[in-house]
Amino acid sequence: MNVGIKGFGAYAPKNIIDNAYFEQFLETSDEWISKMTGIKERHWADEDQDTSDLAYNASIKAIEDAGIQPVDIDMIIVATATGDMPFPSVANILQERLGTGKVATMDQLAACSGFMYSMITAKQYIQSGDYKHILVVGADKLSKITDMTDRSTAVLFGDGAGAVVMGEVAEGRGIISYEMGSDGSGGKYLYLDRETGKLKMNGREVFKFAVRIMGDASTRVVEKAGLSSEDIDLFVPHQANIRIMESARERLGIEREKMSVSVNKYGNTSAASIPLSINQELQNGKIKDDDTLVLVGFGGGLTWGAIVIKWGK
């Protein structure tokens, strides 16, 4: 059975925050932020918008694109590090709002790698034969856990969501190869502080890890798929920092024009990062049926995940 994406949707909140905003209260500048990160702006949700709201807006688009009804969904997996509350899960909340029926639901916490983890998990359930359509969502409201007094992190993060309906696809399409991994010894480099409830990051250590693992994991899944870098039509890395992305691209041996870049518009949106980038390329007509994509993410944990997928239903 070939398992892939049958429907796609994405959502970014309406509030656009440019770099000049931070010049009002932090010792920084648009020039510095752009040069060091590649970020020009990011979208932030309203205070009364929850992660489940972002997830819902992306999900209804994915279900419609798949040509099915909510009742046809057999399971919901949400990748998020910023649930509305500790429990119930965002997936539980989505199940009720979408009207899917009393299906299995779970949130998956792998930070910025979460969308990769969740797609790979859904693939296994579908291949087991027990589930036909699984809704996979990557959604985060990072603005609520960002320390606005910390210049090194305040400028980096945005809010958003992306969703896919996964199921059986045509011969030759779908997920070809994948990899997931973690290194708990690096957990201290990127975490949510218990006392403040805000994100903390050792930028230097995360940068070193990300450059190495994004390039290496991408190379391994391409080789596992029996392909070479020349066979890749689009490289979609986690949109954390343009310098990390460029380094990973170079390690993989992909031309610059084959790398998706949306970090300038959305910043780092964690689990929503890769689907938001895919959405941009779909809108720009850069993804066509039977194109081969490499998706790769890294995140707190430290975690990583990579997928080679042949696009098309």
From Swiss-Prot:
Its EC number is 2.3.1.180. The keyword Acyltransferase applies. It is found in: Cytoplasm. Homodimer. This is Beta-ketoacyl-[acyl-carrier-protein] synthase III. GO terms for biological process: fatty acid biosynthetic process. Keywords: Acyltransferase, Cytoplasm, Fatty acid biosynthesis, Fatty acid metabolism, Lipid biosynthesis, Lipid metabolism, Multifunctional enzyme, Transferase. The last Arg residue of the ACP-binding site is essential for the weak association between ACP/AcpP and FabH. GO terms for cellular component: cytoplasm. It catalyses: malonyl-[ACP] + acetyl-CoA + H(+) = 3-oxobutanoyl-[ACP] + CO2 + CoA. It comes from Staphylococcus epidermidis (strain ATCC 35984 / DSM 28319 / BCRC 17069 / CCUG 31568 / BM 3577 / RP62A). The keyword Electron transport does not apply. The active site is at C112, H238, N268. Pathway: Lipid metabolism; fatty acid biosynthesis. Catalyzes the condensation reaction of fatty acid synthesis by the addition to an acyl acceptor of two carbons from malonyl-ACP. Catalyzes the first condensation reaction which initiates fatty acid synthesis and may therefore play a role in governing the total rate of fatty acid production. Possesses both acetoacetyl-ACP synthase and acetyl transacylase activities. Its substrate specificity determines the biosynthesis of branched-chain and/or straight-chain of fatty acids. Belongs to the thiolase-like superfamily. FabH family. GO terms for molecular function: 3-oxoacyl-[acyl-carrier-protein] synthase activity; beta-ketoacyl-acyl-carrier-protein synthase III activity.
